[in-house]
Amino acid sequence: MNRRKIIAVLAITAGAALLATTATALSRGDDPAPAASGAAVVRSDVQRTISAAQDRLKRVPGDAATWAQLGSAYVEQARITGDPTYYAKAQGALDTSLQHKPESNGPAHLGLGALANARHDFAAARDQAELARDALPDTAEVYGVLADALTQLGEADEARAAVQRMLDLEPGVPAFTRAAYDFEQRGDVDAARQALTRALDASPSPADSLFCRYHLGELAFDNGDLDEAAAQYEQGLQIDPLDPALLQGRAKIAAARGDLADALTIYADLVTRVPSPQYLHENAVLLGVAGRTEDAARQFDLLAQQERLLAAAGSTDELATSIVAADRGDPTTALAAAEREWNRRQHPLVADALAWALHLAGRDAEAIGHADRAAATGWRNATFAFHRGMILRALGRTAEAADALGSALKTNPHFSPVDAPAARSALDGLR
């Protein structure tokens, strides 16, 4: 289960920090929210921010700053609820802010940048973040939105500079988590772990602690340490037993340890409460592994419905489309989507998806260049290594194929409930 959406999740931290500032400005008279559940605190904070902004705009309808705050809150609400209709509300509020203050409106451009990242329009996100930076050159959140966009566009050096600026301005959870992702993409797992640990130590709220525990668990899982991954997920679940991301981690551990029934029970609850494309996809794959093909097909149908809703709300995720199509045995759709995404951005995840789609289409001579490009950063990514190994095997480069497949299984023997067994079988055939 490739952690392909981590940067979208990382964007949450900058949004949460901005919303915390917003909530303080708008709701000074409110009682503090209870700290019993990290997710509940975030939901409560965002809803209070929205309500306070709406109340103020009834009194002062021309307040550009409050329109920007409302728009940013709607972006966060879309993430929390999984309801993409909030994107249009966010767009409207942020555009209204710019109508009232068209020049030097840093908060509106910052919100539009976060919105564009959420919609996977990373070029627009970069442009909006740069406008926000012009108005707010010493605001850390600006560099978080900019770093996310640059990372996804494949502009690694520029993204690293933005993260460093963020660290210089405000060395807290949003900066440390982005630094961790940068280290991970370069293959420095120890540095990534240290950065996430610093983020955890700096966490000012239960929600931030949950976030850090989840990503420490993901880092451990992606590098084959199931015990450490499970420990991180479970420590987070002690804070909030219903946190969806941490429950997804628990489900992955169960599947990796061979307890498909437990994993599917967890996913059944997850997709009912949070029917995100990621969870629907992962559930469908596991259902297929369990032999429940009709149930898997229904999950894929629900996934297609969710993707149509996202597209209607202005969100385009051709990378996810390609990955899902490949998993469903549709190389034509997988390749078309991967090519469209590659034309938009040259990120290693997109290079890998394009390589795999080309392989499935029987075009291995073209595929290997993209697989090599995905591997060139040094990222210890078992999926990258597996795809590259299978392409090399198809090209008859057996020694290199065996090395790549062995690397995939050494990095994470449980990287996929489908592809890890396929890697073992292919490797056995090469020996």
What are these language model-derived features?
Residues V46, I80, Y87, F122, ...:
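TPR-repeat structural position
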Residues T66, P107-A108, V142, A175-F176, ...:
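TPR alpha-solenoid repeat register
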